Amino acid sequence: MESLQSNSKIEEAEQNPKIEEAQVSVSLPEEPTGVLLPSELVDDSAPPESSDAVEESIETASEAEVSISLLEGTTTGTALLPSEENDLAPLESSGIIEEPIDTDLEKLDVVAMDVDQPGSDLKIESDSFSEEAPTTSSSDNPKSPKLDSVANQNGSAMEEDEGDEEQDDPPHKKLKQLDCLTSVAVKEEEEPEQVLPSEAMVVEEAATLVASAAKKSKSKKKNNNVWVTKSTRKGKKKSKANTPNPAAVEDKVLITPVPRFPDKGDDTPDLEICLSKVYKAEKVEISEDRLTAGSSKGYRMVRATRGVVEGAWYFEIKVLSLGETGHTRLGWSTDKGDLQAPVGYDGNSFGFRDIDGCKIHKALRETYAEEGYKEGDVIGFYINLPDGESFAPKPPHYVFYKGQRYICAPDAKEEPPKVVPGSEISFFKNGVCQGAAFTDIVGGRYYPAASMYTLPDQSNCLVKFNFGPSFEFFPEDFGGRATPRPMWEVPYHGFNGRLETNGSEDMKS
Protein backbone atom coordinates (compact mmCIF):
# COMPACT_ATOMS: atom_id res chain seq x y z
CA MET A 1 0.00 0.00 0.00
CA GLU A 2 2.85 2.35 0.75
CA SER A 3 4.29 1.81 -2.71
CA LEU A 4 0.95 2.70 -4.33
CA GLN A 5 0.67 5.89 -2.35
CA SER A 6 4.14 6.97 -3.39
CA ASN A 7 3.25 6.31 -7.07
CA SER A 8 0.14 8.52 -6.88
CA LYS A 9 2.14 11.36 -5.50
CA ILE A 10 4.64 11.04 -8.30
CA GLU A 11 1.82 11.15 -10.89
CA GLU A 12 0.51 14.39 -9.37
CA ALA A 13 3.96 15.86 -9.76
CA GLU A 14 4.09 14.80 -13.39
CA GLN A 15 0.77 16.61 -14.21
CA ASN A 16 2.22 20.01 -13.27
CA PRO A 17 3.38 21.63 -16.53
CA LYS A 18 4.82 24.68 -14.87
CA ILE A 19 8.03 23.05 -13.89
CA GLU A 20 10.16 22.85 -17.00
CA GLU A 21 13.60 22.99 -15.51
CA ALA A 22 14.55 21.94 -12.07
CA GLN A 23 17.97 21.78 -10.49
CA VAL A 24 18.00 19.87 -7.33
CA SER A 25 20.97 19.81 -5.09
CA VAL A 26 20.92 17.47 -2.18
CA SER A 27 23.45 17.81 0.56
CA LEU A 28 24.06 14.97 2.94
CA PRO A 29 23.93 15.72 6.65
CA GLU A 30 27.21 16.62 8.31
CA GLU A 31 26.95 13.80 10.83
CA PRO A 32 29.14 11.21 9.02
CA THR A 33 32.75 11.52 9.98
CA GLY A 34 34.25 9.96 6.85
CA VAL A 35 34.05 9.78 3.07
CA LEU A 36 32.67 6.68 1.46
CA LEU A 37 35.19 4.99 -0.71
CA PRO A 38 33.79 4.17 -4.16
CA SER A 39 35.44 0.78 -4.24
CA GLU A 40 33.49 -0.36 -1.20
CA LEU A 41 30.01 1.11 -1.99
CA VAL A 42 28.56 -1.78 -3.94
CA ASP A 43 28.89 -5.47 -3.45
CA ASP A 44 29.27 -7.18 -6.85
CA SER A 45 27.62 -10.35 -5.69
CA ALA A 46 24.50 -8.63 -4.26
CA PRO A 47 23.31 -5.57 -6.27
CA PRO A 48 21.11 -3.11 -4.41
CA GLU A 49 17.40 -3.81 -4.53
CA SER A 50 15.00 -1.16 -5.87
CA SER A 51 11.27 -1.02 -5.33
CA ASP A 52 8.71 -1.26 -8.14
CA ALA A 53 7.38 2.19 -7.36
CA VAL A 54 10.73 3.77 -8.02
CA GLU A 55 11.10 1.89 -11.31
CA GLU A 56 7.67 3.18 -12.50
CA SER A 57 8.56 6.76 -11.61
CA ILE A 58 11.82 6.45 -13.56
CA GLU A 59 10.00 5.08 -16.62
CA THR A 60 7.56 8.00 -16.69
CA ALA A 61 10.51 10.35 -16.75
CA SER A 62 12.37 8.55 -19.50
CA GLU A 63 13.69 11.62 -21.17
CA ALA A 64 14.97 13.17 -17.98
CA GLU A 65 18.71 13.58 -17.77
CA VAL A 66 20.19 13.54 -14.32
CA SER A 67 23.77 14.50 -13.66
CA ILE A 68 25.27 13.72 -10.32
CA SER A 69 28.63 15.06 -9.33
CA LEU A 70 30.65 14.49 -6.16
CA LEU A 71 32.13 17.81 -5.20
CA GLU A 72 35.27 17.93 -3.06
CA GLY A 73 35.23 21.68 -2.61
CA THR A 74 32.44 24.21 -2.16
CA THR A 75 29.13 23.24 -3.86
CA THR A 76 27.78 25.60 -6.54
CA GLY A 77 24.24 25.36 -7.97
CA THR A 78 21.22 27.30 -8.95
CA ALA A 79 19.13 26.10 -6.04
CA LEU A 80 20.20 24.49 -2.74
CA LEU A 81 17.46 22.79 -0.78
CA PRO A 82 18.68 21.81 2.65
CA SER A 83 16.20 20.12 4.88
CA GLU A 84 16.20 23.00 7.33
CA GLU A 85 15.03 25.64 4.73
CA ASN A 86 11.94 23.71 3.64
CA ASP A 87 8.82 25.29 5.13
CA LEU A 88 6.73 22.17 4.94
CA ALA A 89 7.56 19.08 6.90
CA PRO A 90 9.11 16.45 4.65
CA LEU A 91 6.80 13.70 3.62
CA GLU A 92 7.44 10.33 5.11
CA SER A 93 9.13 8.18 2.56
CA SER A 94 7.95 4.69 2.10
CA GLY A 95 9.85 1.88 3.64
CA ILE A 96 10.32 0.37 0.21
CA ILE A 97 12.38 3.35 -0.91
CA GLU A 98 14.39 3.66 2.33
CA GLU A 99 15.15 -0.03 2.63
CA PRO A 100 17.85 -0.27 -0.05
CA ILE A 101 19.47 2.92 1.18
CA ASP A 102 19.62 1.62 4.73
CA THR A 103 21.00 -1.72 3.67
CA ASP A 104 23.66 -0.03 1.58
CA LEU A 105 24.68 2.22 4.45
CA GLU A 106 25.13 -0.77 6.73
CA LYS A 107 27.56 -2.36 4.29
CA LEU A 108 29.78 0.68 4.04
CA ASP A 109 33.20 0.77 5.75
CA VAL A 110 34.03 4.26 6.86
CA VAL A 111 37.59 5.56 7.05
CA ALA A 112 38.07 8.22 9.72
CA MET A 113 38.63 11.67 8.26
CA ASP A 114 38.14 15.28 9.29
CA VAL A 115 34.46 16.14 9.77
CA ASP A 116 34.88 19.69 8.58
CA GLN A 117 36.28 18.60 5.21
CA PRO A 118 34.02 20.13 2.51
CA GLY A 119 34.21 17.08 0.26
CA SER A 120 31.32 15.41 2.06
CA ASP A 121 28.60 17.35 0.20
CA LEU A 122 26.86 15.86 -2.75
CA LYS A 123 25.10 17.88 -5.46
CA ILE A 124 22.44 16.50 -7.77
CA GLU A 125 21.51 18.60 -10.78
CA SER A 126 18.63 17.96 -13.12
CA ASP A 127 18.72 19.88 -16.40
CA SER A 128 15.18 19.58 -17.66
CA PHE A 129 12.27 17.25 -17.86
CA SER A 130 10.35 16.47 -21.03
CA GLU A 131 7.12 18.25 -21.76
CA GLU A 132 5.29 14.96 -21.90
CA ALA A 133 6.03 14.13 -18.29
CA PRO A 134 5.93 17.30 -16.19
CA THR A 135 6.15 16.95 -12.43
CA THR A 136 3.89 18.81 -10.01
CA SER A 137 3.49 18.77 -6.26
CA SER A 138 0.24 18.70 -4.33
CA SER A 139 1.50 21.51 -2.14
CA ASP A 140 2.55 25.02 -3.06
CA ASN A 141 6.24 24.14 -2.68
CA PRO A 142 7.34 22.77 -6.06
CA LYS A 143 10.30 20.91 -4.53
CA SER A 144 8.80 17.86 -2.90
CA PRO A 145 10.69 15.50 -0.57
CA LYS A 146 9.57 12.67 -2.83
CA LEU A 147 11.78 14.02 -5.56
CA ASP A 148 14.59 14.26 -3.04
CA SER A 149 14.29 10.60 -2.17
CA VAL A 150 14.13 9.59 -5.83
CA ALA A 151 17.15 11.75 -6.60
CA ASN A 152 19.03 10.25 -3.69
CA GLN A 153 18.37 6.74 -4.99
CA ASN A 154 19.32 7.71 -8.54
CA GLY A 155 22.46 9.40 -7.27
CA SER A 156 23.46 6.34 -5.30
CA ALA A 157 22.92 4.19 -8.40
CA MET A 158 25.09 6.52 -10.47
CA GLU A 159 27.79 6.50 -7.81
CA GLU A 160 27.70 2.72 -7.76
CA ASP A 161 28.15 2.66 -11.56
CA GLU A 162 31.13 5.01 -11.27
CA GLY A 163 32.54 2.88 -8.45
CA ASP A 164 32.23 -0.24 -10.63
CA GLU A 165 34.10 1.48 -13.46
CA GLU A 166 36.87 2.56 -11.12
CA GLN A 167 37.03 -0.86 -9.45
CA ASP A 168 37.71 -2.65 -12.74
CA ASP A 169 41.32 -1.50 -12.90
CA PRO A 170 42.18 0.19 -9.59
CA PRO A 171 45.75 1.33 -8.98
CA HIS A 172 47.02 -0.76 -6.09
CA LYS A 173 49.25 1.86 -4.52
CA LYS A 174 46.83 4.80 -4.95
CA LEU A 175 44.27 3.48 -2.48
CA LYS A 176 46.13 5.25 0.24
CA GLN A 177 49.13 7.47 -0.07
CA LEU A 178 51.72 6.65 2.55
CA ASP A 179 53.62 9.65 3.82
CA CYS A 180 56.09 7.43 5.63
CA LEU A 181 56.27 3.81 6.65
CA THR A 182 56.22 4.54 10.34
CA SER A 183 53.00 6.61 10.12
CA VAL A 184 51.18 3.64 8.58
CA ALA A 185 52.27 1.38 11.41
CA VAL A 186 51.19 3.94 14.02
CA LYS A 187 47.80 4.46 12.34
CA GLU A 188 47.25 0.74 12.12
CA GLU A 189 47.85 0.40 15.86
CA GLU A 190 45.58 3.33 16.70
CA GLU A 191 42.65 2.26 14.44
CA PRO A 192 42.82 -1.50 13.99
CA GLU A 193 39.07 -1.83 13.44
CA GLN A 194 38.89 0.67 10.54
CA VAL A 195 41.72 -0.76 8.42
CA LEU A 196 40.39 -2.17 5.16
CA PRO A 197 41.62 -5.51 3.85
CA SER A 198 43.50 -3.81 1.03
CA GLU A 199 45.13 -1.41 3.49
CA ALA A 200 46.16 -4.33 5.70
CA MET A 201 48.01 -5.81 2.77
CA VAL A 202 49.73 -2.48 2.17
CA VAL A 203 50.72 -2.31 5.83
CA GLU A 204 52.16 -5.83 5.69
CA GLU A 205 54.17 -4.92 2.61
CA ALA A 206 55.42 -1.78 4.35
CA ALA A 207 56.45 -3.84 7.38
CA THR A 208 58.35 -6.23 5.15
CA LEU A 209 60.07 -3.29 3.48
CA VAL A 210 61.09 -1.91 6.86
CA ALA A 211 62.42 -5.30 7.94
CA SER A 212 64.36 -5.74 4.71
CA ALA A 213 65.82 -2.24 5.06
CA ALA A 214 66.92 -3.04 8.61
CA LYS A 215 68.54 -6.26 7.45
CA LYS A 216 70.37 -4.40 4.70
CA SER A 217 71.66 -1.84 7.18
CA LYS A 218 72.89 -4.62 9.46
CA SER A 219 74.48 -6.46 6.59
CA LYS A 220 76.34 -3.31 5.63
CA LYS A 221 77.95 -3.21 9.05
CA LYS A 222 79.39 -6.66 8.51
CA ASN A 223 82.45 -6.42 6.36
CA ASN A 224 81.96 -9.45 4.12
CA ASN A 225 83.98 -8.17 1.23
CA VAL A 226 85.58 -11.23 -0.35
CA TRP A 227 88.06 -9.11 -2.30
CA VAL A 228 89.77 -7.82 0.82
CA THR A 229 92.58 -10.01 2.10
CA LYS A 230 92.57 -10.50 5.84
CA SER A 231 95.93 -12.21 6.05
CA THR A 232 97.88 -8.97 5.96
CA ARG A 233 96.48 -7.71 9.24
CA LYS A 234 97.03 -11.02 10.98
CA GLY A 235 100.55 -11.10 9.66
CA LYS A 236 101.21 -7.71 11.20
CA LYS A 237 99.96 -8.93 14.55
CA LYS A 238 102.22 -11.95 14.36
CA SER A 239 105.17 -9.80 13.44
CA LYS A 240 104.47 -7.57 16.43
CA ALA A 241 104.30 -10.59 18.69
CA ASN A 242 107.60 -11.85 17.34
CA THR A 243 109.39 -8.59 18.03
CA PRO A 244 111.48 -8.82 21.19
CA ASN A 245 110.15 -6.89 24.14
CA PRO A 246 112.84 -4.65 25.62
CA ALA A 247 111.43 -5.19 29.10
CA ALA A 248 111.60 -8.97 28.67
CA VAL A 249 115.31 -8.82 27.84
CA GLU A 250 116.07 -7.78 31.41
CA ASP A 251 116.85 -10.34 34.08
CA LYS A 252 113.76 -11.86 35.66
CA VAL A 253 113.74 -11.87 39.44
CA LEU A 254 111.19 -13.98 41.30
CA ILE A 255 110.39 -12.38 44.63
CA THR A 256 109.48 -14.84 47.37
CA PRO A 257 108.53 -14.29 51.01
CA VAL A 258 111.63 -13.76 53.08
CA PRO A 259 111.89 -15.24 56.58
CA ARG A 260 111.67 -12.93 59.52
CA PHE A 261 114.79 -10.80 59.92
CA PRO A 262 116.56 -12.50 57.00
CA ASP A 263 119.47 -10.09 56.90
CA LYS A 264 119.74 -9.53 60.60
CA GLY A 265 121.55 -11.38 63.37
CA ASP A 266 122.58 -10.63 66.96
CA ASP A 267 125.82 -12.61 66.89
CA THR A 268 129.18 -10.98 66.43
CA PRO A 269 132.71 -12.37 66.35
CA ASP A 270 133.42 -10.72 69.73
CA LEU A 271 130.57 -12.50 71.52
CA GLU A 272 130.44 -16.05 72.77
CA ILE A 273 127.56 -18.37 72.01
CA CYS A 274 124.39 -17.44 73.88
CA LEU A 275 120.62 -17.26 73.45
CA SER A 276 119.42 -15.18 70.53
CA LYS A 277 117.26 -12.12 71.07
CA VAL A 278 116.14 -12.25 67.45
CA TYR A 279 115.31 -15.88 66.86
CA LYS A 280 112.89 -16.42 69.71
CA ALA A 281 109.19 -16.09 70.38
CA GLU A 282 108.01 -12.73 71.71
CA LYS A 283 106.61 -14.27 74.88
CA VAL A 284 109.92 -15.89 75.80
CA GLU A 285 111.92 -13.89 78.34
CA ILE A 286 115.72 -13.97 78.42
CA SER A 287 118.00 -13.00 81.29
CA GLU A 288 120.69 -10.36 81.06
CA ASP A 289 123.48 -12.89 80.60
CA ARG A 290 121.37 -14.43 77.77
CA LEU A 291 121.71 -17.91 79.23
CA THR A 292 118.39 -18.28 81.13
CA ALA A 293 114.97 -18.35 79.45
CA GLY A 294 111.43 -18.61 80.75
CA SER A 295 107.84 -18.47 79.44
CA SER A 296 104.37 -18.40 80.98
CA LYS A 297 102.14 -18.12 77.87
CA GLY A 298 102.28 -21.60 76.43
CA TYR A 299 104.90 -23.47 74.49
CA ARG A 300 107.28 -21.08 72.72
CA MET A 301 110.81 -21.69 71.51
CA VAL A 302 114.15 -19.93 71.76
CA ARG A 303 117.42 -21.01 70.16
CA ALA A 304 121.11 -20.18 70.45
CA THR A 305 123.05 -17.76 68.29
CA ARG A 306 125.32 -20.39 66.79
CA GLY A 307 124.73 -23.86 65.39
CA VAL A 308 126.73 -26.83 64.16
CA VAL A 309 126.65 -28.55 60.78
CA GLU A 310 129.38 -31.16 61.19
CA GLY A 311 131.12 -33.09 63.99
CA ALA A 312 130.18 -34.19 67.54
CA TRP A 313 129.00 -31.50 70.00
CA TYR A 314 127.62 -31.32 73.51
CA PHE A 315 125.85 -28.82 75.86
CA GLU A 316 123.71 -28.98 79.03
CA ILE A 317 120.42 -27.45 80.25
CA LYS A 318 119.47 -27.31 83.93
CA VAL A 319 115.77 -27.13 84.88
CA LEU A 320 115.63 -24.31 87.41
CA SER A 321 111.86 -24.13 87.96
CA LEU A 322 108.80 -25.90 86.64
CA GLY A 323 106.16 -24.71 89.09
CA GLU A 324 102.83 -26.40 89.61
CA THR A 325 101.91 -26.60 85.90
CA GLY A 326 105.24 -25.96 84.14
CA HIS A 327 106.66 -28.30 81.47
CA THR A 328 109.55 -28.23 79.06
CA ARG A 329 110.67 -29.72 75.76
CA LEU A 330 114.37 -29.41 75.11
CA GLY A 331 116.58 -30.43 72.19
CA TRP A 332 117.93 -29.32 68.80
CA SER A 333 116.40 -27.25 66.00
CA THR A 334 117.45 -26.10 62.55
CA ASP A 335 117.13 -22.55 61.27
CA LYS A 336 113.73 -23.51 59.77
CA GLY A 337 112.18 -24.57 63.07
CA ASP A 338 108.93 -22.82 64.10
CA LEU A 339 109.62 -20.37 66.93
CA GLN A 340 105.94 -20.17 67.89
CA ALA A 341 105.76 -23.89 68.68
CA PRO A 342 107.55 -26.30 71.01
CA VAL A 343 110.65 -28.23 70.09
CA GLY A 344 109.75 -31.34 68.09
CA TYR A 345 106.61 -29.73 66.60
CA ASP A 346 107.78 -30.19 62.99
CA GLY A 347 110.42 -32.07 61.04
CA ASN A 348 113.00 -29.36 61.67
CA SER A 349 113.42 -29.98 65.41
CA PHE A 350 113.97 -32.91 67.82
CA GLY A 351 112.79 -32.76 71.47
CA PHE A 352 112.96 -34.54 74.82
CA ARG A 353 109.81 -34.33 76.99
CA ASP A 354 109.86 -33.88 80.78
CA ILE A 355 106.57 -35.60 81.71
CA ASP A 356 107.23 -39.23 80.78
CA GLY A 357 110.63 -38.99 79.10
CA CYS A 358 109.23 -39.33 75.55
CA LYS A 359 111.06 -38.16 72.46
CA ILE A 360 109.17 -35.90 70.04
CA HIS A 361 109.65 -35.29 66.33
CA LYS A 362 107.07 -34.03 63.83
CA ALA A 363 104.66 -33.71 66.78
CA LEU A 364 104.79 -37.48 67.36
CA ARG A 365 105.67 -38.78 70.79
CA GLU A 366 107.55 -42.05 71.20
CA THR A 367 108.68 -43.88 74.30
CA TYR A 368 112.30 -43.19 74.94
CA ALA A 369 113.52 -42.97 78.56
CA GLU A 370 112.36 -44.94 81.57
CA GLU A 371 111.19 -41.80 83.31
CA GLY A 372 111.01 -38.09 82.77
CA TYR A 373 112.95 -35.29 84.44
CA LYS A 374 112.04 -32.69 87.02
CA GLU A 375 113.34 -29.53 88.70
CA GLY A 376 117.05 -29.64 89.48
CA ASP A 377 117.88 -32.25 86.85
CA VAL A 378 120.61 -31.58 84.30
CA ILE A 379 119.93 -32.79 80.78
CA GLY A 380 122.85 -33.34 78.40
CA PHE A 381 122.43 -33.05 74.59
CA TYR A 382 124.69 -34.90 72.22
CA ILE A 383 124.75 -34.64 68.39
CA ASN A 384 127.07 -36.24 65.88
CA LEU A 385 127.11 -35.26 62.18
CA PRO A 386 130.01 -37.07 60.55
CA ASP A 387 130.95 -35.27 57.32
CA GLY A 388 127.73 -33.33 57.65
CA GLU A 389 129.01 -30.41 55.54
CA SER A 390 128.70 -32.41 52.36
CA PHE A 391 125.08 -33.31 53.17
CA ALA A 392 123.94 -29.94 54.38
CA PRO A 393 121.54 -28.06 52.11
CA LYS A 394 122.78 -24.99 50.31
CA PRO A 395 122.10 -21.78 52.17
CA PRO A 396 119.66 -19.34 50.56
CA HIS A 397 121.15 -16.99 48.01
CA TYR A 398 120.51 -13.30 48.60
CA VAL A 399 120.82 -10.61 45.96
CA PHE A 400 120.53 -6.86 45.83
CA TYR A 401 117.89 -5.60 43.38
CA LYS A 402 117.04 -1.92 43.05
CA GLY A 403 118.33 -1.11 46.51
CA GLN A 404 116.55 -3.97 48.24
CA ARG A 405 117.77 -7.36 49.36
CA TYR A 406 115.88 -10.37 48.06
CA ILE A 407 116.18 -14.10 48.40
CA CYS A 408 116.35 -16.09 45.21
CA ALA A 409 113.68 -18.67 44.65
CA PRO A 410 114.86 -22.24 45.10
CA ASP A 411 115.40 -24.29 42.02
CA ALA A 412 112.47 -26.53 41.14
CA LYS A 413 114.90 -29.37 40.42
CA GLU A 414 116.50 -29.06 43.82
CA GLU A 415 116.89 -32.40 45.57
CA PRO A 416 115.24 -33.09 48.94
CA PRO A 417 117.37 -32.89 52.11
CA LYS A 418 119.94 -35.63 52.33
CA VAL A 419 120.35 -37.92 55.29
CA VAL A 420 123.72 -37.83 57.02
CA PRO A 421 124.89 -41.43 57.42
CA GLY A 422 125.91 -42.31 61.00
CA SER A 423 124.30 -39.19 62.41
CA GLU A 424 122.78 -39.42 65.89
CA ILE A 425 121.06 -37.40 68.61
CA SER A 426 121.19 -38.68 72.20
CA PHE A 427 120.01 -37.30 75.56
CA PHE A 428 121.66 -37.65 78.97
CA LYS A 429 120.07 -37.25 82.38
CA ASN A 430 122.47 -36.21 85.14
CA GLY A 431 125.35 -37.68 83.14
CA VAL A 432 123.58 -40.97 82.31
CA CYS A 433 122.92 -41.73 78.64
CA GLN A 434 119.27 -42.46 77.88
CA GLY A 435 120.19 -44.11 74.58
CA ALA A 436 120.12 -42.99 70.96
CA ALA A 437 116.94 -40.97 70.42
CA PHE A 438 117.25 -40.19 66.69
CA THR A 439 119.56 -41.61 64.06
CA ASP A 440 120.26 -40.87 60.40
CA ILE A 441 118.98 -37.33 60.55
CA VAL A 442 119.03 -35.00 57.59
CA GLY A 443 121.92 -32.67 57.03
CA GLY A 444 121.71 -29.06 58.14
CA ARG A 445 122.77 -26.57 60.78
CA TYR A 446 121.45 -27.47 64.23
CA TYR A 447 121.03 -24.98 67.06
CA PRO A 448 120.51 -25.66 70.80
CA ALA A 449 116.82 -24.96 71.55
CA ALA A 450 114.35 -25.02 74.43
CA SER A 451 110.60 -24.49 74.86
CA MET A 452 108.70 -23.84 78.10
CA TYR A 453 105.06 -23.99 79.14
CA THR A 454 103.27 -22.57 82.18
CA LEU A 455 99.66 -21.62 82.88
CA PRO A 456 98.90 -17.91 83.28
CA ASP A 457 99.12 -16.21 86.68
CA GLN A 458 101.88 -18.58 87.74
CA SER A 459 105.63 -18.29 87.99
CA ASN A 460 107.64 -18.82 84.83
CA CYS A 461 109.17 -22.13 83.94
CA LEU A 462 112.93 -21.38 83.91
CA VAL A 463 115.79 -23.26 82.27
CA LYS A 464 119.49 -22.37 82.12
CA PHE A 465 121.88 -23.21 79.25
CA ASN A 466 125.50 -24.27 79.77
CA PHE A 467 127.60 -24.24 76.59
CA GLY A 468 130.88 -25.10 78.42
CA PRO A 469 133.71 -25.34 78.70
CA SER A 470 132.99 -26.72 82.18
CA PHE A 471 129.91 -28.89 82.59
CA GLU A 472 128.14 -30.04 85.70
CA PHE A 473 127.52 -33.63 84.49
CA PHE A 474 129.83 -34.24 81.61
CA PRO A 475 129.63 -37.97 80.68
CA GLU A 476 132.72 -40.05 81.37
CA ASP A 477 131.70 -42.78 78.94
CA PHE A 478 129.79 -42.12 75.73
CA GLY A 479 129.33 -45.82 74.98
CA GLY A 480 131.59 -46.01 71.95
CA ARG A 481 130.38 -42.69 70.49
CA ALA A 482 132.71 -40.01 69.30
CA THR A 483 133.84 -37.68 72.04
CA PRO A 484 132.02 -34.37 71.61
CA ARG A 485 133.31 -30.86 71.79
CA PRO A 486 131.65 -28.19 73.94
CA MET A 487 129.41 -25.77 72.09
CA TRP A 488 131.35 -22.72 73.27
CA GLU A 489 134.06 -23.76 70.74
CA VAL A 490 131.72 -23.31 67.77
CA PRO A 491 133.28 -20.60 65.58
CA TYR A 492 131.42 -17.54 64.45
CA HIS A 493 129.73 -18.42 61.18
CA GLY A 494 127.75 -15.28 60.56
CA PHE A 495 124.20 -15.24 59.33
CA ASN A 496 122.98 -18.51 57.79
CA GLY A 497 126.50 -19.88 57.58
CA ARG A 498 127.84 -16.86 55.62
CA LEU A 499 130.40 -14.56 57.13
CA GLU A 500 129.02 -11.04 57.42
CA THR A 501 130.98 -7.85 56.97
CA ASN A 502 130.00 -4.32 57.85
CA GLY A 503 128.59 -3.76 54.38
CA SER A 504 127.29 -7.32 53.96
CA GLU A 505 129.06 -7.46 50.62
CA ASP A 506 128.95 -11.25 50.57
CA MET A 507 125.18 -11.09 50.13
CA LYS A 508 125.37 -8.82 47.12
CA SER A 509 126.66 -11.56 44.87
UniProtKB/Swiss-Prot annotation:
GO terms for biological process: embryo development ending in seed dormancy; simple leaf morphogenesis; vegetative to reproductive phase transition of meristem. Keywords: Nucleus. Residues 70-81 have a biased composition (Low complexity). Signal peptide: none annotated. Residues 1-100, 112-199, 213-246 are annotated as: Disordered. Disruption phenotype: Embryo lethality when homozygous. Eearly flowering. Slightly lower ATX1 occupancy at the 5'-end regions of the target genes. Decreased TATA-binding protein (TBP) levels lower Ser5P Pol II levels near the transcription start sites (TSSs) of target genes and of Pol II at the genes 3'-ends thus affecting the transition from transcription initiation to transcription elongation. Significantly reduced trimethylated 'Lys-4' of histone H3 (H3K4me3) levels at the 5'-ends of WRKY70 and LTP7 genes leading to reduced transcript accumulation. Residues 133-142 have a biased composition (Polar residues). Transmembrane segments: none annotated. Residues 253-472 form the B30.2/SPRY domain. GO terms for molecular function: chromatin DNA binding. Its main location: nucleus. Ubiquitous. Highest expression in pollen and seeds. Expressed in the embryo and the suspensor cells. Detected in cotyledons, roots, leaf hydathodes, sepals, anthers and pollen grains. Strongly expressed in root tips, shoot apices, vascular tissues, developing embryos and endosperms. Residues 158-168 have a biased composition (Acidic residues). Residues 231-240 have a biased composition (Basic residues). SMART domains: SPRY. It holds the Pfam family SPRY. The keyword Phosphoprotein does not apply. InterPro entries: ASH2 (IPR037353), B30.2/SPRY (IPR001870), B30.2/SPRY_sf (IPR043136), ConA-like_dom_sf (IPR013320), SPRY_dom (IPR003877). Residues 9-21 have a biased composition (Basic and acidic residues). GO terms for cellular component: nucleus; Set1C/COMPASS complex. Disulfide bonds: none annotated. PANTHER family: SET1/ASH2 HISTONE METHYLTRANSFERASE COMPLEX SUBUNIT ASH2, SET1_ASH2 HISTONE METHYLTRANSFERASE COMPLEX SUBUNIT ASH2. Named TRAUCO (TRO) in honor of the fertility mythology from the Chiloe island in southern Chile. Part of a complex composed of TRO, RBL and WDR5A. Interacts with RBL, but not with WDR5A or WDR5B. This complex is formed during both vegetative and reproductive development. Trithorax-group gene homolog required for early embryogenesis. Required for the expression of FLC and FLC homologs and represses flowering. Required for proper leaf growth and development. Part of COMPASS-like complexes responsible for H3K4 trimethylation, but not for di- or mono-methylation of histone H3 'Lys-4'. Binds to target loci chromatin, increasing H3K4 trimethylation and causing activation of the gene. Involved in the transition from transcription initiation to transcription elongation. This is Protein TRAUCO. It comes from Arabidopsis thaliana. The gene is TRO.
